[in-house]
From Swiss-Prot:
GO terms for biological process: ribosomal small subunit assembly; translation. The gene is rimP. Its main location: cytoplasm. This is Ribosome maturation factor RimP. It holds the Pfam family RimP_N. It comes from Cytophaga hutchinsonii (strain ATCC 33406 / DSM 1761 / CIP 103989 / NBRC 15051 / NCIMB 9469 / D465). The keyword Phosphoprotein does not apply. Required for maturation of 30S ribosomal subunits. One of its GO terms (cellular component) is cytosol. The keyword Nucleus does not apply. Keywords: Cytoplasm, Ribosome biogenesis. Belongs to the RimP family. It is found in: Cytoplasm. It comes from the Bacteria.
Amino acid sequence: MSKQELEIKTYVSDLLQERAELFLVDIAFSGTHSRRKILVILDKDSGILIDECGEFSRALGNLIEENNLFGDNAYVLEVSSPGMDRPLLVSRQYKRRIGNTLSFLLNDGTQFDAVLESVSEEGVVVMPAPQKVKKSNKKEAVVDVAIEPRKLRFEEIKKCNLIVSFK
């Protein structure tokens, strides 16, 4: 990790301390030394507003400029909300999704959809969706099989996305 990346992470951390309702979802660096791209993804429990992203971007940009972090080199700073299509990465994101259907990919390769029932510091409890099974020569049918809630530790989850439904 470069000196600039460490400095930016420190700036983000300091700015978040002043804005306790916001939390960091992810920070990514890309580009070349002469043209860096910094992507900061923020959220809050009630959902972050575009104005809050803009205000945070201005504050972070001011710190970068005041400290002449990139000298004469160009950089692009983007501060964004996670968006509905991005994976859930931190436990606070899961709390907002209680009652929603999520798509899980576990570290062991298991994939399934489930309704998020609860969230703790260690992980989540989900209710898997009914399974589709074939009955003889008939088409697939959803069969009511006794499905039990399933506990997952965050360490077991490789990827988790919200399933967006427009019903």
